[in-house]
Amino acid sequence: MAYFLEQTDSEIFEFIVEEFKRQNEHLEMIASENYTFPSVMEAMGSILTNKYAEGYPNKRYYGGCEVVDKIESLAIERAKKLFNCQFANVQAHSGSQANNAVYHALLKLYDKILGMDLSCGGHLTHGAKVSLTGKHYQSFSYGVGLDGYIDYEEALKIAQSVKPQIIVCGFSAYPREIDFKKFREIADAVGALLLGDIAHVAGLVVANEHAHPFPHCHVVSSTTHKTLRGPRGGLILTNDEEIAAKIDKAIFPGTQGGPLMHVIAAKAVGFKENLKPEFKAYAKLVKSNMQVLAKTLKEKNHKLVSGGTSNHLLLMDFLDKPYSGKDADIALGNAGITVNKNTIPGETRNPFVTSGIRIGSAALSARGMGAKEFEIIGNKISDILNDINNVSLQLHVKEELKTMANQFPVYHQPIF
């Protein structure tokens, strides 16, 4: 197959080939990463990248939008059907952009946000001091108890003391299910709006493998990749017409200009895939595979935050180990297992070193790996961590896992 890119920019082409090889031969276990559908990539690489379309369907500032109006309208309708809600904005460029747009729509400068503490699994956009949300608004945080689960009673006490305008329930590194109903009770008790950030678990939500944020949340944000397996992008959902109008204005012209029509088309394609029965089977596999991995690691006496997992990710706890999350990240990477270092509750090391790693099952499940493979992977992770400085062992495991990975190709035909 001939590629224009190979002829016009051989350097970038070779880097893409190199990355294609890495994705095929390594075991991708970063919880926020996944392998998207070939049809999604085709839509993203289409001529739609040429079209500017500021505004919304049938309310554009540019001409020639009659076709992209159909595309965005279809993406909106599919999103509403998928999440069983009345309003959807599909223009957000990312999950962070989606969250920032929600704040821009519903808060005033220096209003109060209550979100999950970063070291307990929250996201930068939930009020971290280093992010815009921590600078433009007064941010406060709730966390987890000694058992690693969200402490809802403590969250209520903090909310009663702080009286935030918005409470964010969601995470980037929390291995348990969110109780949206309890968070709504907390929000109602203090007169706050409730934002459900389901970026990580959206794929599980639509497959009924995780609690649904509606009707409890006033507004819901998500990414369209991660467990949804769509293109990289953001999404905002609500059942409130007034909030929906504010969200639309906050996205355009509030925080963004022209939407990425090739990505919006890809979102529509992804949503259609998510609506298929096969996707429900995939989401079920994601959860069951993670259960196998957690069980295997626990049987090998490895400590997990909260003692296990209820979703697509787990966190390994190295607080009492001589090695750090960074050490484990590097060692496992040398063995062909890609994870990420992560802060954990009770963190004692700095964020560039950390005392934990985050591991996800979504990408390998997309390749078709099941319980047998995840048990093997769990045992190999244990072997590496128990002899973390053994480079020869890491290289040996890498070759073993490469053989296994090649039995589950990412894509069955050349596609970049």
Curated annotation (Swiss-Prot):
The keyword ATP-binding does not apply. Keywords: Amino-acid biosynthesis, Cytoplasm, One-carbon metabolism, Pyridoxal phosphate, Transferase. It is found in: Cytoplasm. Its EC number is 2.1.2.1. Pathway: One-carbon metabolism; tetrahydrofolate interconversion; Amino-acid biosynthesis; glycine biosynthesis; glycine from L-serine: step 1/1. (6S)-5,6,7,8-tetrahydrofolate binds at L118, G122, H123, L124, E242. It catalyses: (6R)-5,10-methylene-5,6,7,8-tetrahydrofolate + glycine + H2O = (6S)-5,6,7,8-tetrahydrofolate + L-serine. Its main location: cytoplasm. GO terms for molecular function: glycine hydroxymethyltransferase activity; pyridoxal phosphate binding. SUPFAM superfamilies: PLP-dependent transferases (SSF53383). Homodimer. PANTHER family: SERINE HYDROXYMETHYLTRANSFERASE. HAMAP family: SHMT (MF_00051). This is Serine hydroxymethyltransferase. The gene is glyA.
